[in-house]
Amino acid sequence: MQKNKQSIDEIAILLNGKASKKGLFVCGLNSLDLAEDSDISFFAGNKKNLPQLVNTKAAVVVLKKDDINFCKTDYIVVDDPYFAFSKLSNIFDNRKKIIPCTKESVKIGINSNVPKSSFIDDFVVIGDNVKIGENVSIYPGVKIENDVEIGDNSVIHQNVVIKENTRIGQNCTIFANATIGTDGFGYALDKNQWVKINQLGSVVIGNFVDIGSNSTIDRGALQNTIIEDGVKIDNQVQIGHNCIISKNTIIAGCVGIAGSTIIGEGCKIGGAAMILGHLNIESETTISPGTMIASSINKKGETYTGFFPFFEKKDWIKVTMFLKRLLRKWV
């Protein structure tokens, strides 16, 4: 991939930082240990990585003022190097830019609006009464059912399925193979037979939401499933019907959230955590990876950890038997 030369002076301005030397140029972004003498890198402050900072071959390192003495190369001082990294990743993203067009193989239903500023790739199917905003990009194989709305500047990657009546806000990104608006898991037991409950709600997604590959967000039974502004969802996440995920919550991969649970604003949910249904999780809660949440959390800003350490199988059996004996004593 061809690299573009970037001015350190201009980068420092974009990062709201101060460069150690003017007139330098860099051609790429890389980690401290892999950077070459034409690259820029960053040091987020983790002392475990100090040897990488000391020995890096990078031309320029973005770091905090406190870490200057460990750096043997030129640098840009900023308040938050990791946030600066997010800006650098945008500057050095050299992937091919999209030219607006609608490919011939696209199928568009009745009364659907596709602006000329949008990019609609091969074999996309768009249903009836669909409203697509300006500068939207939709990649091959996407299926959009009737009465869907997609806001400006959103990106829908390959093979995503968006079910009827779903609303997606502006500046959202939905990655490959995600499914939005499938039926929630609702059944009523009639004697010995499970009878399906039709899911009559939909899914409403706010602005600046990211949804990872192979994630599923179920439509509500009656009310809508809601994903508010700024939520970031990793790959293979399951969100059940009627859930509300509040603003700026971030959810790591393989998390399962059962139906009708409300997650507060600014929560952090670690990978493979399990959250049972009909719960309320207070804002700014952190849930550690692998933790099962079985009751509501009412304290703001706390961290909850509930995973059990693993053992060799023979030791696990001993621990299990010990716990059983303890239980008999308590009962």
Model regions and ranges:
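Short N-terminal secondary-structure initiator segments
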Residues: M1-S20, V130, V136, V237-G256, ...
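Residue-level recognition of short, solvent-exposed, well-ordered loop/turn junctions
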Residues: E36, G151, V204-G206
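Right-handed parallel beta-helix
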Residues: I99-N165, G169
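Glycine-rich hexapeptide-repeat left-handed beta-helix
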Residues: Q158-V331
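Terminal amphipathic alpha-helical/low-complexity segments used for targeting or macromolecular assembly
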Residues: M1-S105, T166, N171, N177-A178, ...
